[in-house]
UniProtKB/Swiss-Prot annotation:
Organism: Geobacillus kaustophilus (strain HTA426)
Primary localization class, coarse: cytoplasm
EC class (word): transferase
GO cellular component: cytoplasm
Protein name stated in the entry: Ribosomal protein L11 methyltransferase
Biological process annotations from GO: methylation
């Protein structure tokens, strides 16, 4: 089978939004080539060692590659992708160069591209993320393994916003907690909360592609008895109180439901947020304070920010 590789040269800020557009267009996988992966300290990744080829990475910005089946609808699909990406300007998302190119690859090249960019990554004291085809032996009995299907948007490691959310969940989720994951995407944060002992996790996403992917990954990690995945717009119509709410989405979207998050959290509960670029940090902080939260932590990794807010 022939595949067409669509390559988009963009910014860190636009990665998650463009990845979502590509999945909705039916991409058979997304690869993220981020030059930060070449220069970041290995200590940040708990000793993970991966051989990376500098020739695969841009000097600046990020390259997102996706694979589309070559068929009679390819031209129309590519035009729809371009239009959807251009529309991101309406949300004040910086697209950078926004250079889009196409090339053809065969089935074997497509499979090789995946394996080149997808490796086990230890992202916190407890969590290691492992692609489904790799055999990985835990270093200790306390290490928690999250298996992920390669159909998700993954780069050579894990996106900094996901890493910071995982680290915050590890710190704040307690056995018996009730957790809500807003904009669950692949479901990775919901899976982590379940593995940390949460009694129940509600994984919410408006995108039906994300809902299907999250359900597959939840089942793959055998936590479907704890995690319920459903299609939902943010926290609309959600009434069950929570001990922890986590949201790894754009700052503008976080600000739309800070009031709902405050309403649903129990006293002493925490709202863990990321997907925030440095330029939007103060906006998110101000919005959380206005909703009644106290700011407990602000963490930074590369150009990204995570905020942990406490409901007094």
């Amino acid at each position: 089978m022939k595949w067409s590789e669509i390559s988009i040269h963009t910014t860190h800020e636009a990665v998650e939004a463009i990845s979502n557009i590509l999945h909705e267009a039916g991409a058979g996988g997304v690869v993220i080539e981020d030059p930060y992966d070449l220069v970041k300290e290995r200590d940040d990744w708990y000793g993970e060692i991966v051989e990376l080829n500098p020739d695969d990475y841009p000097e600046e910005g990020v390259i997102i590659k996706a694979y589309l089946p070559v068929n009679s609808f390819l031209g129309e699909t590519v035009e729809q992708i371009k239009q959807a990406i251009n529309n991101l300007w309406l949300y004040d998302i910086d697209l950078g160069k926004n250079k889009i190119t196409l090339s053809e690859v065969n089935e074997e090249e497509w499979a090789t591209a995946w394996k080149k960019h997808y490796h086990p990554v230890k992202v916190s004291e407890k969590f290691t993320i492992v692609p489904t085809w790799e055999t990985y032996e835990p270093a200790s009995r306390d290490e928690l393994i999250i298996e992920m299907d390669p159909g998700m948007a993954f780069g050579t490691g894990t996106h900094p916003t996901t890493v910071m959310c995982l680290q915050a969940l590890e710190k704040y989720v307690r056995p018996g907690d009730h957790v809500i994951d807003v904009g669950t995407g692949s479901g990775i944060l919901s899976i982590a909360a379940a593995m940390l002992g949460a009694q129940s996790v509600r994984a919410l996403d408006l995108d039906p592609v994300a809902v299907d992917s999250a359900r597959l990954n939840v089942k793959l990690n055998k936590v479907q008895h704890i995690v319920t995945v459903s299609q939902n717009n943010l926290l609309d119509h959600i009434e069950e109180p929570a001990d922890v709410i986590v949201a790894n989405i754009l700052a503008e979207i976080i600000l739309r439901f800070t009031g709902d998050a405050y309403r649903l959290l129990k006293p002493g509960g925490r709202f863990i947020t990321s997907g925030i670029i440095q330029a939007k940090k103060q906006d998110v902080k101000d919005g959380l304070l206005a909703a009644g939260f106290a700011i407990e932590e602000i963490n930074v990794m590369e150009d990204w920010v995570a905020v942990v807010a406490l409901k007094p």
